[in-house]
């Protein structure tokens, strides 16, 4: 069967830059699935994406499906014919569905009986006939939150479509996709290269587009070029470019022919906190800031043009003129804001609603202030500084700078606090109160900042759960999942002595009578333990390990983490699987027991050598392990408990648990309950698979 290269390119107007990669990757995944479902043999499926096109190139695509033999078994002979030998309705219906008569059906005989059988040789359809619908289906399944319509057409897509190229080798596959007749015409760069040209063979893509159209269709190649050229441009001016992955992706999605240029701004603007300048450059203008080797912002920036100019100085000058007013605004806001102390903004917080049932930002500030002080006392931080940080925590939201440049919240609070002469750990806490903002983000760096960050997040969790507005599905308007995980990360990774039970109770108490959910504390803790599950799964722990620890519902995050590590290590021991199975057996036996057990194991009632030996081991281990459990040395405890494998195996091999004599039976059940209690001091290992 011959194979050819297949190409599909959808030429559009400018696609959403932040969605470009996901659109292209989804297109490739969808089309690959269509090929596989259709049984079309193929090689590598390569995707291309630029601001005005999505494309796929499939190597070694078969020109048709393979022929196949089809077998459909019908009713059993006993049900296929009546007593007179006439076909039943079931048989006729089956035959009709196969496109034959009952007389034309074959017979299938096995040792289990005899059935009607339909066999047919089905010729594979051509790729040319199959591909148009497969492309249309793949496009229809793209993750597009909002479709648009253009012209008088009823066609919907993420952006208007102008060209559709479908080539199998050198042949155009005729089709109408998204309202456009397929062709071999491709559009080049808007201002460089050829506006339109024809492609003779699918193998010419993307090289022909590069040479004639001045478009780098390979997304990764375009991104790599921007990164390399920007690094070189920064090196030439003695700096390092801030090439954050998210901005690199966005810029790569905005240009077809990247040209990296360097520009500058007035040094006077460096008196403004760097974060505000960077926010303007990266957020508004999509520029790359440049820092010196000491990490200090330089009065330069790197940007990417979408065209080669004979006079690049004009493009540079134009970008400098665009950014200058924004930097001047930041300078004005900074100077204006410093005329007031942060504390002077407190009254205005009363005018901003946090949540209708939970009050204003001033109300939230008062709660955070009290909770941060309480947390500081629990973890050994400076209570006065934590309380002060709580009082000032939301004041920067009322400043001109943060109102205009919203992403500078927190960091501007730090700068203004320093200007006001606040303690350094208070100032730093104002910046770090929102950390961690995302997975892998830095944690607060000092104890006061930890207290404030936890207080802010716990106040939100207690409040929103307290009025019954739990996250539902993907909807989480108050970012409660992120808040919960942030609290857990801080407590675990900073090894803080905090209990979710008392922490949540204190956070809820500060709301007074505003909360309507009587189960708020349990709901918040359950929610946070659920985030533990997600966190540890991401860390590579198995689900059953997590479930074994969750079964004990430990509410101290640092303690939870210690149990997780202990159980994970326990699983590597030779004795683990046998002891997990034994615990499962013990759990099942105890669940079926209906008689009340003894408080202790009575040695005088023990008869068999195996039960006497097991009881002796349990007494020794119980006394030895109490300090281990008290100190959270769970890994050492489980290593010691692994020694129970032999006596437990002996017990189950030689002892009848449900003896006829009641006192012996109850004593043996009590012995097993004591065994289980020891393991449950760490986790429910009966849940391990």
Curated annotation (Swiss-Prot):
Keyword Aminoacyl-tRNA synthetase part of the UniProt annotation: yes
Entry keyword Protein biosynthesis: yes
Top-level taxonomic group: Bacteria
PROSITE patterns assigned to the protein according to its UniProt record, in alphabetical order: AA_TRNA_LIGASE_II_GLYAB
Cell compartment(s), UniProt: Cytoplasm
Location (main, coarse): cytoplasm
InterPro entries: DALR_anticod-bd, Gly-tRNA-synth_bsu, Gly-tRNA-synth_heterodimer
Pfam families in the record: DALR_1, tRNA_synt_2f
Any one cellular-component term (Gene Ontology): cytosol
Catalytic function, reaction form: tRNA(Gly) + glycine + ATP = glycyl-tRNA(Gly) + AMP + diphosphate
GO molecular function terms noted in the UniProt entry: arginine-tRNA ligase activity; ATP binding; glycine-tRNA ligase activity
EC number: 6.1.1.14
GO biological process, one term: arginyl-tRNA aminoacylation
UniProt keyword annotations, A-Z: Aminoacyl-tRNA synthetase, ATP-binding, Cytoplasm, Ligase, Nucleotide-binding, Protein biosynthesis
Subunit description: Tetramer of two alpha and two beta subunits.
HAMAP family registered for this protein in UniProt: Gly_tRNA_synth_beta
Family classification: Belongs to the class-II aminoacyl-tRNA synthetase family.
Protein name: Glycine--tRNA ligase beta subunit
Organism this protein belongs to: Salmonella agona (strain SL483)
């Amino acid at each position: 069967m011959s194979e050819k290269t297949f190409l599909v390119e959808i030429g559009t107007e400018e696609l959403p830059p932040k969605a470009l990669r996901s659109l292209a990757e989804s297109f490739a995944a969808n089309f690959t699935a269509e090929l596989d479902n259709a049984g079309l043999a193929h090689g590598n499926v390569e995707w291309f994406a630029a601001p005005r096109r999505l494309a796929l190139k499939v190597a070694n695509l078969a020109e048709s499906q393979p022929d196949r033999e089809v077998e459909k078994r019908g009713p059993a002979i006993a049900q296929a014919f009546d007593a007179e030998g006439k076909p039943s309705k079931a048989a006729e219906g089956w035959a009709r569905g196969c496109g034959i008569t009952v007389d034309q059906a074959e017979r299938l005989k096995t040792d289990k009986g005899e059935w009607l059988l339909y066999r047919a040789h089905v010729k594979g359809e051509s790729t040319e006939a199959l591909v148009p619908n497969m492309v249309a289906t793949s496009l229809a399944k793209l993750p597009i939150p909002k479709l648009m319509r253009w012209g008088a057409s009823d066609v919907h897509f993420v952006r208007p479509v102008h060209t559709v190229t479908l080539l199998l080798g050198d042949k155009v596959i005729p089709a109408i996709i998204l309202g456009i007749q397929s062709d071999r015409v491709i559009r080049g760069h808007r201002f460089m290269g050829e506006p339109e040209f024809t492609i003779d063979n699918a193998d010419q893509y993307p090289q022909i587009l590069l040479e004639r159209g001045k478009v780098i269709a390979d997304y990764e190649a375009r991104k790599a070029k921007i990164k390399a050229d920007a690094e070189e441009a920064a090196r030439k001016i003695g700096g390092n470019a801030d090439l954050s992955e998210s901005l690199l992706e966005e810029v790569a999605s905005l240009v077809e022919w990247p040209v990296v240029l360097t520009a500058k701004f007035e040094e006077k603007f460096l008196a403004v906190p760097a974060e505000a300048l960077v926010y303007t450059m990266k957020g508004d203008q999509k520029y790359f800031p440049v820092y010196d080797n000491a990490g200090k912002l330089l009065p330069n920036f790197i940007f990417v043009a979408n065209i080669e100019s004979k006079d690049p100085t004009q493009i540079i000058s134009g970008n400098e003129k665009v950014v200058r007013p924004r930097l001047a605004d930041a300078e004005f806001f900074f100077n204006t804001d410093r005329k007031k102390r942060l504390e002077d903004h407190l009254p205005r917080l009363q005018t901003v609603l946090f949540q209708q049932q939970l009050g204003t930002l001033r109300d939230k500030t008062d709660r955070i202030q009290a909770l941060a002080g309480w947390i500081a006392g629990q973890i050994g931080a400076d209570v006065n500084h934590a309380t002060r940080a709580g009082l000032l925590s939301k004041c920067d939201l009322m400043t001109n700078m943060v109102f205009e440049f919203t992403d500078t919240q927190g960091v501007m609070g730090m700068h203004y606090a320093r200007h006001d002469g606040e303690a350094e750990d208070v100032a730093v806490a104002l910046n770090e109160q929102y950390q961690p903002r995302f997975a892998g983000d830095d944690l607060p760096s000092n104890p006061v900042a930890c207290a404030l960050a936890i207080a802010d997040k716990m106040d939100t969790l207690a409040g929103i759960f307290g009025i019954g507005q739990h996250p539902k599905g993907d909807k989480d308007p108050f970012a409660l999942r992120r808040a919960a995980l942030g609290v857990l990360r801080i407590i675990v990774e900073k090894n803080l002595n905090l209990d979710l039970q008392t922490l949540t109770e204190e956070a809820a108490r500060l709301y007074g009578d505003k909360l309507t959910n009587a189960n708020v504390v349990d709901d918040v803790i359950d929610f946070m333990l659920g985030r533990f599950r997600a966190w540890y799964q991401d860390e590579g722990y198995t689900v059953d390990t997590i479930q074994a620890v969750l079964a004990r519902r430990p509410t101290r995050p640092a303690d939870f983490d210690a149990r997780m590590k202990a159980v994970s290590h326990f699983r590597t021991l030779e004795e683990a699987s046998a002891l997990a199975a034994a615990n499962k057996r013990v759990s099942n036996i105890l669940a079926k027991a209906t008689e009340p057990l003894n408080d202790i194991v009575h040695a005088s009632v023990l008869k068999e050598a195996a039960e006497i030996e097991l009881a002796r081991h349990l007494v020794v281990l119980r006394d030895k392990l109490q300090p281990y459990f008290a100190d959270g040395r769970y890994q050492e405890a489980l290593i010691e408990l692994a020694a129970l494998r032999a006596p437990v195996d002996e017990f189950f091999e030689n002892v009848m648990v449900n003896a006829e004599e009641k006192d012996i039976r109850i004593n043996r059940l009590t012995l097993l309950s004591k065994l289980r209690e020891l393991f449950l001091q760490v986790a429910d290992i009966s849940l391990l698979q």
